[in-house]
Regions:
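Metal-dependent phosphoesterase/phosphodiesterase active-site architecture
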Residues: 1-167
Length: 167
């Protein structure tokens, strides 16, 4: 804060300030109870698959999803594929990593997610772009309202697993 000038910056736990978003290769996500909660009862498996319905089926549409953690309308999201600009589209969808790290784990352990952990609502800060190829590398640049820049060179195909996102 400097007089009436207020600035802030999001910092995720266990990461540095430059980790402002996470990317998902939709072609590599098939979210079923068999994949992520294999020990869940049939009713829990059904509940999980209902909650994860947007991610349940395989896709070859070449969409990449970008979860921008502290997004507001003053941010800029820029994506290029082989030098060609792709237009990010803001979508309303559940975060797939949240589904597998919270809901699937609880169902797999024989309990239901609490309302604090269950992804009952969609996320309002996920964008998607449609790539032309399943194996292209995307250059992603996110700039917050204060000019702080975060980048990723997303090599595809990119596997979807909890371990992949711990890196």
């Amino acid at each position: 804060m400097n007089g009436t000038d207020v600035k802030w910056r999001f910092k995720p736990t266990g990461r540095d300030f430059n980790y402002a978003f996470r990317t998902y290769d939709r072609n590599k996500i098939v979210m079923t109870a068999a994949n992520f909660a294999p020990k869940a009862s049939s009713s829990h498996a059904s509940s999980f698959e209902s909650s994860a319905s947007s991610w349940k089926s395989s896709s070859k549409d070449n969409y990449v999803y970008i979860n921008v953690f502290d997004y507001d309308k003053s941010w800029m999201i820029e994506v290029t594929e082989n030098g060609k600009s792709l237009t990010p589209e803001l979508v309303s969808i559940k975060d797939p990593l949240h589904l597998v790290t919270y809901e699937a784990k609880r169902y797999n352990d024989g309990s239901a997610p609490t309302s604090d952990f269950k992804a009952r609502t969609v996320t309002s800060h996920i964008f998607r772009v449609k790539a032309s190829s399943a194996s292209s590398t995307l250059e992603i640049k996110v700039t917050d309202r204060f000019g702080n820049v975060s980048t990723e060179s997303m090599k595809r195909p990119r596997e979807f697993s909890i371990d992949e996102y711990k890196k």
